[in-house]
Structure formats: structure tokens, C-alpha cells
């Protein structure tokens, strides 16, 4: 009895110990998430959960990546998660990354979240130098990355040194030139300031449009050997298969677009490619590992499917997504226009306020100056009045002295002088008295004139005082603020109506909206052509400007190859591949075998 109870207890405890779930950590380009997954879950169950959590509908570009012995692998959708060769230590870690790249990012990437994830991944690949980017293009891409993060450039906010902690340029580019971080920031900021008005999603899309023209964008490279044992590189991307020299990952030697390939298969380490034309012999190559062949096959199948899908009509789901994206873009555009109008009106109101404050300050200064002038006039008038009074008193005193002298002269004349000497002395005194009297009279006349002049100056000073008081009165009675026209309230934006019926989404535009949007689209096309030409000129100008600061001895092999391509008038990546496919598939296969 006791033994049976013990066996039941041990069985139940064993049953409790068996886990029903396991923990998974998902690492995206800008976040980490953890999920509890059921033991029976397949790769598709986990992948769908991650996509739902991110709100991502363009799932066909992405996958869950893990590493096996330094080799990249992708989670298979139809296989249990724990049946993969992954670490059994929890949490089991996967990286949510773009597995396949679009041919044209602007046309194919519909959702904003899709664009954002691609932007982050491509930016990291450029900074980690997994994608070669020439120096002048690196500066331009950095300016769009700054616009996406910081918004419009504002000199009062984005002061010198605000990019000091940002990783914006590949280390290879920084080491290639004798330039300080401040010099790089100055050049990045000069372009950043030109991107005013671009929203985050627009700046990120501009980044991708430039990056997708880089030679190594979206290419997965694998070391292979042909029948002769020559070491080569196989490049797999959205356009097809490309064969490279191991020392030159920029320009393929030959290319096979997906529409020329009928079948792809491998056996052990040998890979077989069957061209669409059955008259052409298959061509084979060997890879280093069986696991690598599995990865090559996955990438070939996925890229081929997307290549064919792009050349067919969009599915209903994609059509709905694109319609919804257009509606969302139109709504955001209208919202941005409304905000721009409000911002413009606010700036105008602030300018009007600043002008009024300036005029008020000016009027205050004028009033202060008028008061000071009035005070000086009053002081001058007081001084002149005092001086006139003193002069008048002096004139009276001189007149009194002159009268006394006259009286003295008369008294002397009336006095009888008996002797001739006394008479002569008396005549001399009389003469002196007359001279003194004449001087006194002249001085008195001069003082009188001076008093008259002072009275006239006093009258003028009082007139100046009256004018100063009048001006002060005029300033005081002026209106402080000029009449302002009332600022009209922002008009409500003409937001289109959204009607959701079942799974269908309808979008109604007014005729005026459609005409306006058509005009804006046409205008954007013209502006884009002008900007493209201007952009190339700017890139060439920057390249010339910093060329003198380049340290030639630090150039990498890819730098040298890129410069040689440029010197030969190198064309774009797509044009290069197009030229390589002008030869017949048969001659290209033969060329591959002879490499």
C-alpha cells in the first residue's frame, strides 16, 4: 500500500516537472521582446506572434535568424521551434531581421513599420561596413538619419556638438580623412538643414532610396568553387544570382536574373542551377558546408518568389494595404499642412508681437529723450533768467555810478578855483571825470544790450521748453499698439472620410482634393528631378572639397575599386547587371565554367 502511494507521488511530481512552455527572446533592430511559447509551437506560430506584436503585415520580407557554429540560419515555418539546432538554454534568442530586400523600396515597402525596420537594418549594415558606401554618400545618408531622429534643424536647439555622441559614419570613412569630428558635423549639418519639412518616414525612405543603389545592398555573399576549383563568390539578391571575384564584391563578373533560372537544387555540397532554356547545360558549383547550401536554397526560393510576384498584379491583401497606406499618407500630409499653417500663423503673430514690442520700446526711448530735453531746457531757462537778472542789476549800478560822476563833475565846475594851478588841476580832474563818465556810459550801454540779448535767449529757451512739452504730450497721447487685424482661426482641414465595411476600405476624396493632390504629385516629380541633379552636383562638390584631406595610404581595397569604377564613368548597379545579361545565357554559363 505504502509502495503504491509512493509510486503515484513520484509519477505526479515527475508530471509536474515537465515544462509546458519555454521562453523566447526576440531581438529587433531597436527593441527586445520575450514570449512564453508552447512546446509544440512551430516556427510559423512564433513568427506570426512577433509580427502581430509589431503590427507588421508585410511579413514576406522578414524572418527569425539564429546562429549555428558561426553560420547564419533562419527559423523554418513548418518545423517546431525546439527541433531546430538552437540553444536549449532559456531564453532561446532569435533576431527578427529582413531576410529579403525589395528591388524598389519606395514602391514595395507599404507600411511605415516595414520602412522603419529596413532603415534601421540597412543603416547598421552601412555603419558596420557590411555594405560599402563611398564617403560623400555616407555624409548624405548621415544627414537623412539625423533628420529622421531630430526632425527639422533649429540652430537655437541643435547647437555645435549636438552630434558628438552619434554614430553616423563608418569608421573606415572617418579614418580615411584628416578631419576632426567638428568638421564632419559641420558638413552633415549643412545637408541636414536642407531637409526641412521632411517627416521621419519621408527621411527614412530617402535614406533607403539612396542606399538601394549601393553595390552591396541586399546581397548575400557565399564562398563557392566552380568545376575548375576556382574560388569565387556567389551573390544572391532580389534581381538574381551574381558571380564575383573574391577580391571585388562591388562588380559581378556575370549575372543570371531570376527569370532565366528554371530550377535550383543541391546534393551534399554541390549546387545545381538549371537555366530556363533547356538547350543550355546546367552549371554547378560547390560550397564549403551543407548547411550553407540549405541557406542558399532558402534565399534563392524566397527571392525568386518575390521577383515573380512583383511582376504580377498585386494580391487583394496588398491592394488593401497600399490603399490604406495612401489614405494614411494623405491624412498625414493634410495634418502636416494644417500644422504648417498654424505654425506660420503663430510665427506671424510672434513677429507682430515682436514688432509692437520694438515700437513700444522705441516710443519709450523717445519719451525719455523728450523728458531729458525738457529738463535741459528748463535748466537753461533758469540759468539765463538768473544771468539776465544779474546783468540788469549791474547795469543799474553802473547807471547810478555814472549819475554820481556827472554830479561830481557839475559840482567841480560850479566850484570857483582861485589859482591857475587849481584851475589846471581842476580841468585835469574834470577831463578824467568826463573820460570816466564816458566809459561808464559805454559800459552801461553794453550791459543794457547784453541784458536785452539775455532776455531774447530766455524767450527762445521758453519757446523750446514749450515745444518739448508739446512733443511729450503727443507721444503720451499716441496709441500704444496699432490696430491689428484679427488673426483668423485655422480653417478645419478637409480630412477625407474613411468607411470600413467588413474587410474593405473605401476612401472618398473631394474633387478639389484630387486636383490639388494631382498638382502636388506633379510638382513633386519636377522637384525630384531638379533635386537629383542638384544632389549629384553636391556630392561631387563635397568629394572634391574633402579630396585634399584624404590619406591615400589608408584606402581599402573597396575604396580603390570604387574609385576605379568612378574614373571609368561607372554606371549604377542596375545598369551594370543589365549590361552583364546582354550576352546569351549559354555564353555566360560557359564563361562561369572557365573562370
UniProtKB/Swiss-Prot annotation:
The modification Phosphoserine is found at residues 13, 518. Pfam families: ERM_C (PF00769), ERM_helical (PF20492), FERM_C (PF09380), FERM_M (PF00373), FERM_N (PF09379). Phosphorylation of Ser-518 inhibits nuclear localization by disrupting the intramolecular association of the FERM domain with the C-terminal tail. The dephosphorylation of Ser-518 favors the interaction with NOP53. Widely expressed. Isoform 1 and isoform 3 are predominant. Isoform 4, isoform 5 and isoform 6 are expressed moderately. Isoform 8 is found at low frequency. Isoform 7, isoform 9 and isoform 10 are not expressed in adult tissues, with the exception of adult retina expressing isoform 10. Isoform 9 is faintly expressed in fetal brain, heart, lung, skeletal muscle and spleen. Fetal thymus expresses isoforms 1, 7, 9 and 10 at similar levels. Changing residue 234 to R: In SWNV; also found in retinal hamartoma; severe. Keywords: Cell membrane, Cell projection, Cytoplasm, Cytoskeleton, Deafness, Disease variant, Membrane, Nucleus, Phosphoprotein, Tumor suppressor, Ubl conjugation. Changing residue 117 to I: In sporadic meningioma. The keyword Cell membrane applies. Changing residue 219 to M: In vestibular schwannoma; changed interaction with SCHIP1. Probable regulator of the Hippo/SWH (Sav/Wts/Hpo) signaling pathway, a signaling pathway that plays a pivotal role in tumor suppression by restricting proliferation and promoting apoptosis. Along with WWC1 can synergistically induce the phosphorylation of LATS1 and LATS2 and can probably function in the regulation of the Hippo/SWH (Sav/Wts/Hpo) signaling pathway. May act as a membrane stabilizing protein. May inhibit PI3 kinase by binding to AGAP2 and impairing its stimulating activity. Interacts with NHERF1, HGS and AGAP2. Interacts with LAYN. Interacts with SGSM3. Interacts (via FERM domain) with MPP1. Interacts with WWC1. Interacts with the CUL4A-RBX1-DDB1-VprBP/DCAF1 E3 ubiquitin-protein ligase complex. The unphosphorylated form interacts (via FERM domain) with VPRBP/DCAF1. Interacts (via FERM domain) with NOP53; the interaction is direct. Interacts with SCHIP1; the interaction is direct. This is Merlin. It comes from Homo sapiens (Human). The gene is NF2.
Amino acid at each position: 500500500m505504502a509502495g503504491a502511494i509512493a509510486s503515484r507521488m513520484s509519477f505526479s511530481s515527475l508530471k509536474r516537472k515537465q515544462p509546458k512552455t519555454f521562453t523566447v527572446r526576440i531581438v529587433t533592430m531597436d527593441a527586445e521582446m520575450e514570449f512564453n511559447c508552447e512546446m509544440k509551437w512551430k516556427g510559423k506560430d512564433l513568427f506570426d506572434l512577433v509580427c502581430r506584436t509589431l503590427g507588421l503585415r508585410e511579413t514576406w520580407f522578414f524572418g527569425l535568424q539564429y546562429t549555428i557554429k558561426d553560420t547564419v540560419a533562419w527559423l523554418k515555418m513548418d518545423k517546431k521551434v525546439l527541433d531546430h539546432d538552437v540553444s536549449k538554454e532559456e531564453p532561446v534568442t532569435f533576431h527578427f531581421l529582413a531576410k529579403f530586400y525589395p528591388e524598389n523600396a519606395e514602391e514595395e515597402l507599404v507600411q511605415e513599420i516595414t520602412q522603419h525596420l529596413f532603415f534601421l537594418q540597412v543603416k547598421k549594415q552601412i555603419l558596420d561596413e557590411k555594405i560599402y558606401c563611398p564617403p560623400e554618400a555616407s555624409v548624405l545618408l548621415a544627414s537623412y538619419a539625423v533628420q529622421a531622429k531630430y526632425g527639422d534643424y533649429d540652430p537655437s536647439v541643435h547647437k555645435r556638438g549636438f552630434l558628438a555622441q552619434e554614430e553616423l559614419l563608418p569608421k573606415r570613412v572617418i579614418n580615411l580623412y584628416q578631419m576632426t569630428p567638428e568638421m564632419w558635423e559641420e558638413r552633415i549639418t549643412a545637408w541636414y538643414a536642407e531637409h526641412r519639412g521632411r517627416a521621419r518616414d519621408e527621411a527614412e525612405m530617402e535614406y533607403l532610396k539612396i542606399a538601394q543603389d549601393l553595390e552591396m545592398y541586399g546581397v548575400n555573399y557565399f564562398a563557392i568553387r566552380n568545376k575548375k576549383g576556382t574560388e569565387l563568390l556567389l551573390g544572391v539578391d532580389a534581381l538574381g544570382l551574381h558571380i564575383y571575384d573574391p577580391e571585388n564584391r562591388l562588380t559581378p563578373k556575370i549575372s543570371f536574373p531570376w527569370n532565366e533560372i528554371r530550377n535550383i537544387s543541391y546534393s551534399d555540397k554541390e549546387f545545381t542551377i538549371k537555366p530556363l532554356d533547356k538547350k543550355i547545360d546546367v552549371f554547378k558549383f560547390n560550397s564549403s558546408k551543407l548547411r550553407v547550401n540549405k541557406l542558399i536554397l532558402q534565399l534563392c526560393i524566397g527571392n525568386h518568389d518575390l521577383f515573380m510576384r512583383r511582376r504580377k498584379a498585386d494580391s487583394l491583401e496588398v491592394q488593401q494595404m497600399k490603399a490604406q497606406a495612401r489614405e494614411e499618407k494623405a491624412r498625414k500630409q493634410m495634418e502636416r499642412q494644417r500644422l504648417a499653417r498654424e505654425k506660420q500663423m503663430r510665427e506671424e503673430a510672434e513677429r507682430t508681437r515682436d514688432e509692437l514690442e520694438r515700437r513700444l520700446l522705441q516710443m519709450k526711448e523717445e519719451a525719455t529723450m523728450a523728458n531729458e530735453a525738457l529738463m535741459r531746457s528748463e535748466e537753461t531757462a533758469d540759468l539765463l533768467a538768473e544771468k539776465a537778472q544779474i546783468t540788469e542789476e549791474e547795469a543799474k549800478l553802473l547807471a547810478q555810478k555814472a549819475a554820481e560822476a556827472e554830479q561830481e563833475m557839475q559840482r567841480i565846475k560850479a566850484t570857483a578855483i582861485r589859482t591857475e594851478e587849481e584851475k589846471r588841476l581842476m580841468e585835469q580832474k574834470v577831463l578824467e571825470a568826463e573820460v570816466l563818465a564816458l566809459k561808464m556810459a559805454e559800459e552801461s550801454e553794453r550791459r543794457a544790450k547784453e541784458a536785452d540779448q539775455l532776455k531774447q535767449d530766455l524767450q527762445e529757451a521758453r519757446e523750446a521748453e514749450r515745444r518739448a512739452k508739446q512733443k511729450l504730450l503727443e507721444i503720451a497721447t499716441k496709441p500704444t499698439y496699432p490696430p491689428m487685424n484679427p488673426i483668423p482661426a485655422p480653417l478645419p482641414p478637409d480630412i477625407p472620410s474613411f468607411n470600413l465595411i467588413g474587410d474593405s476600405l473605401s476612401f472618398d476624396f473631394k474633387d478639389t482634393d484630387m486636383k490639388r493632390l494631382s498638382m502636388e504629385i506633379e510638382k513633386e516629380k519636377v522637384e525630384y528631378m531638379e533635386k537629383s541633379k542638384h544632389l549629384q552636383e553636391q556630392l561631387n562638390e563635397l568629394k572634391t572639397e574633402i579630396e585634399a584631406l584624404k590619406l591615400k595610404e589608408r584606402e581599402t581595397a573597396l575604396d580603390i575599386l570604387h574609385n576605379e569604377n568612378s574614373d571609368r564613368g561607372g554606371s549604377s548597379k542596375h545598369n551594370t547587371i543589365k549590361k552583364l545579361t546582354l550576352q546569351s545565357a549559354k555564353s555566360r554559363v560557359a564563361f562561369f565554367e572557365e573562370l
